[in-house]
Amino acid sequence: MQLKFLGKDSKPGESPTLYATDRASYVVQGWIVTDPDILATITLADHETLVEVPAKLMIHLAKDDLSGEVTNLAPPIVHVTAEGNYIVRGVRITDAEALGQMDIPDHETCVEVSKPAVAALLIGG
């Protein structure tokens, strides 16, 4: 899987990042979700996981000709935190080629979500 960097929301010690892939999907890199209340409410398949990212990370979708405001909070966004961050559910990235293109700190992981699913979240693009 080849990745195209779209953008990140960087603060010291934090690096949520958004990538487009060569297979009509996005890779969302974010914080590992550890909140037991959130984990208790979301059912995951064995190949899925969750990441938490700032909502403003999604502005970088415009760099892949997908713009608009996220107004439809539906999968792959499965929860919004009290801080306004998105909890994103997707396929856990295990592809060695993709992982080799990213710098992922120990407190983060990444998921793949389909482009059509992300496009369905937007209005006004």
Sequence positions of predicted segments:
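Pocket-edge structural micro-motifs
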Residues: 7-8, 29-30, 89-90
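Short, ordered beta-strand-loop transition motifs
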Residues: 11, 20-22, 78-84, 105
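Charged/polar low-complexity intrinsically disordered segments, enriched in acidic residues
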Residues: 70-94
